[in-house]
């Protein structure tokens, strides 16, 4: 890293001027840099932190940010820290305050302080689930049960992989807990804040807890008027706006099961999910508004031959489509329960293992896995938010997502169960209106996926907006890019990016960053609380703990909130069959390639089936893509696949690419191929060679934004 940049003690004022900074400002900034280098050296983490705090700002050229970051860490090695926790500020975080109060009780003589004792506490959370989860769920998050569980964890059948029973005997309703008044939430607290695209100069819309409760109760009564059997499935297929959140909570509150369907899905994909879930009704919208476009949604639901639909207008009160016989409008649906307006709805308390939500994995071939969330899964989602993202009362959380995949429900529970506000922008997150919404809503945690950040950096649409209220960013969904996330941190005065890696079947994350640890870009600093990771060697057995290495990831089978069933598959075969045993327990399959670096950070290298063998060297697509994405400024993004030649032999490396300007006809494919070769041979391995480059208008992606390399491998013959 940073080999092409000067070390900081060699930087002079003219280097600032060469980046377009005026001579007067350059002299001032160089003076500050010289003072920092004198006090902290030219290449230490403290040097960088002082540069981030006292020199850099969002309005300075990003090339200056790069020069100083990469120059500071020129010879550092893997995973240099981009953010370091402040020992005093840590004490006010959720985990820091807990450890200050009870650290010695939990860890005894091992406890020193929240920062140096964090890894010991993570291990404690795995070894002592009874203490850890009781503390977090009951004492800290104030989760209430109508019938208390007999214990936190029962392990009657140790020979049954993943067969642990969490909170046995307990009854609760996770939606009711979102609406409860407790020390984290008061009736006049703002719980949802939102704005519609196009209304970017209008005041924000807000719902207090009192108002949210009344809306959810009314929908709960209206659901009961439909006469559906308790426990049946009801689908939601619409953008994630305030009504969608109200409907989601009401379905769970009333004892039904949400079926999550993304609003981007085609009619066949909608039909598949309705069939697998056996949904009895569906909430949807007539159209989706994106800028000046109206994208039909209800017509896709009709084409999917859905059960009865309740249809919400995308704007105003009139539905912009003719309804099928048996379908009803949102207004009529609510009108049937008008006599119960403002009346409290009695939540249906359920056993912990009762289903609340059916979600679907983003499969690239075949039928998607139908994964049920129970009443426990929302608690896992919220606990990750509490411990790793430090979500708490007074926070404002925005994450561009949809109830059709796991980050939608995750956002609902991680915010509301921790007393934070959900911030919703009803429109595209790729426009300046979204950046203004982040500013106006005073967002404290901004969730992203890397492709959104790439677009922001490319278009500079966030320029000029004040993001100083942000305490952290969070990222999930796909591997991120160091340079792009350095740029992102710079938009909010170098607040940390807390990376998270998990899955729908986990209900949250198994690896993440933490406010109690130094954060490195595109890295995970820890195993999640209550989780254990294992990296398998080439023979399929776990490597020694804390030994640096790379291989397929396996998970400890005892994970709070993780799935135990699939509606359309054999859960044991998918997650446990053929996995190694450690200490008498069969490990759980995940399928990612993970790396543990020499300084203790985890890196994700994509799916195990996204690795290739180039010249006898096994490497992940993501490692190749990270290099290729930086080769040519005209290239927006790339993806790499290995293709065996006809007749057999070593895999050939093929790079698909998308241009920033789709109308650019000046690109020379052979020259680009040579540029990719040069970059790969310089940064990865001198034996790597790109055989073909293929232009595309866009990369095929799943609904959760993962690149479908498998599809490209299948389609490559067409390019031939």
UniProtKB/Swiss-Prot annotation:
Q: Which reaction does it catalyse?
A: hexanoate + ATP + CoA = hexanoyl-CoA + AMP + diphosphate
**Signal peptide extent:** none
List the PROSITE patterns hit by this protein, alphabetically.
AMP_BINDING
Membrane topology, as annotated, equals: Single-pass membrane protein
Give me any GO biological process, just one.
terpenoid biosynthetic process
A GO cellular component term found in this entry reads: membrane
Annotated localization: Cytoplasm, Cytosol; Membrane
Q: Which residues bind ATP?
A: 477-479, 499-504, 585, 607, 618
Regions crossing the membrane: 242-262
Q: Where is this site: Hinge residue important for conformational flexibility?
A: 609
Q: Which tissues is this protein detected in according to the database?
A: Accumulates in glandular trichomes, especially in female flowers. Present at low levels in roots, stems and leaves.
InterPro entries to which the protein is assigned, alphabetical: AMP-bd_C_sf, AMP-binding_CS, AMP-dep_synth/lig_dom, ANL_N_sf
UniProt cofactor(s):
Mg(2+)
How is activity tied to temperature here? Optimum temperature is 40 degrees Celsius.
Catalytic activity, EC: 6.2.1.-
Q: What does UniProt list under activity regulation?
A: Inhibitied by high CoA concentrations.
Give the residues the record marks as binding CoA: 290-293, 615, 681
Supply the alphabetized keyword list: ATP-binding, Cytoplasm, Fatty acid metabolism, Ligase, Lipid metabolism, Magnesium, Membrane, Nucleotide-binding, Transmembrane, Transmembrane helix
Q: Which SUPFAM superfamilies match?
A: Acetyl-CoA synthetase-like
pH-related activity note: Optimum pH is 9.
Main function: Involved in the biosynthesis of cannabinoids-related terpenophenolic natural products, which have pharmacological activity. Acyl-activating enzyme that catalyzes the conversion of hexanoic acid to hexanoyl-CoA, precursor of the cannabinoid pathway. Can also activate other fatty acids including heptanoate, octanoate and nonanoate.
The record's PANTHER family line, in alphabetical order, gives: ACYL-ACTIVATING ENZYME 17, PEROXISOMAL-RELATED (PTHR44378:SF2)
Q: Which family does it belong to?
A: Belongs to the ATP-dependent AMP-binding enzyme family.
Q: What is this protein called?
A: Hexanoyl-CoA synthase
Organism name: Cannabis sativa
